[in-house]
Amino acid sequence: MLNKTIPVGVDGSSATITSYVFAPTEDAYALKPLPAVVVVPGGGYDHVSPREGEPVALRLLAMGYQAFVLNYSVAPAVYPLALQELARAVDTVRSHAAEYCVDPDRITVMGFSAGGHLVGLLGVLWDQPWLAESIAASPESIRPDTLCLGYPVVSSGAYAHRGSFEHLTGADGALAQKLLIENMVGEGFPRTFLWHTAEDASVPVQNSLLLAQALADHGIGFSLHVFPHGKHGASLATAQTAFKGCAEHIQSQVQGWPEQFASWERDGR
């Protein structure tokens, strides 16, 4: 396995991606290019949750994906720095596809909670010239082929996780109103796998429902999975990824979402 930290900072920021990828060895069959996933943990734009990073990457690696975890800038840094870092992360994976044994046409960007919001922003803004130009890339090089969003922050309206928007915008309410993913979806938004739990009290399930409605309205392919039980921040919904003392994070029904995502990602080819 090739496990290294790769800088993807913008304007002097310290953002990185950490690789968890299969690497050819002398005694192994030659690897064909594999699909990749850039994992974007949540944390309310206040921190980057380790429970939604490395454990998810290792699970994906075991399933045949080359995985990369983004450690991005959070408050007091404000929009659009984290988005630029994510764009650079995708560009880095795609432009080094041969080195990392990645299929450049099968790059998923996967986000959890506030990380899901950041991924959603890339989904709607990848084709805006200012974003690619700000990191000396092309729009095509930063476009995700698919998205996977787990209990994502989507709306800053009635179902908002307000802390995420305050941290992202520096409490700029007018800017927050411009960053509602469900209102930004256009024809170029990538097809998307969504999952949420109905009991999520921190980021209500309506966030995923609003995004699903927007995707349907624009004719964009999606798969929506709403599990009946589980608190916000479930990650893999196992004992290993549960927040300390939070038994509600351990949910057998939710544990199958990675395989459901992989089946959906493969079948959409």
For the regions a protein language model found, what residue spans apply to each?
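Short amphipathic alpha-helix adjacent to the substrate-entry channel of hydrolases
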Residues: L31, P50-F68
